[in-house]
A protein has these predicted regions:
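Sec-dependent bacterial lipoprotein signal peptides
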Residues: 1-17
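Cross-family detector of peptidyl-prolyl cis-trans isomerase
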Residues: 17-181
């Protein structure tokens, strides 16, 4: 019995004194993934830009404006109002969403009258930036690249992944933050 206990202690001592063998780290090369992702996004942006130029060329009677935010727009009806929405203003607007072939995805009747408090509510980036350049009474058509609207996910309903969209927006009313309603 004593011999078994002593041999067990000796074996435990021997095993505990061994140095752990270091493992080599697994090398993950993320650069190849990143390079592939960058080239895919560049190709997507080029295709979207080409499609926008084709739409603009077909609509030669309209004057499209390139925004610093990365989308194109034209005025269908331009208001004489000079005030543009500021932080905290409440906007009332309607909009249609179309694909690049001018087929309606969501109509203004489906989406109804919308309210948005500027920079205090969630809204797709393109529409958020587009509303900020409008005046009360304006009717504007926006050409949004996919990364300015629903991007890689789509809306999980009618809008597909990486789908560029046309928004036709009517800004009905701007309730200024400082005005008492």
């Amino acid at each position: 019995m004593k011999i078994k206990i002593l041999s067990l202690l000796f074996l435990t001592l021997l095993v505990s004194c061994m140095q752990p063998i270091p493992r080599k780290p697994v090398t993950v090369k993320t650069t190849s993934f990143m390079e592939a992702s960058v080239s895919l996004n560049k190709a997507l942006n080029e295709n979207e830009e080409k499609a926008f130029y084709e739409i603009i060329a077909k609509d030669s009677l309209s004057n499209y404006i390139s925004s610093p935010s990365g989308f194109w727009y034209k005025y269908n009806t331009r208001s004489t109002n000079l005030y543009t929405p500021k932080f905290g203003d409440q906007l009332l607007y309607t909009f249609d969403v179309l694909n690049l072939e001018n087929n309606i995805i969501y109509s203004a009747q489906e989406t109804g009258l919308q309210t948005y408090v500027v920079d205090q509510q969630e809204l797709v980036e393109g529409l958020r930036n587009g509303l900020k350049i409008m005046h009360e009474g304006d009717d504007v058509t926006f050409l949004f690249p996919s990364h300015k609207v629903f991007g890689y996910l789509g809306d999980e309903n009618k809008i597909g992944i990486n789908q560029s969209l046309i928004y036709k927006v009517q800004l009905i009313k701007i309730n200024k933050k400082n005005e008492s309603n």
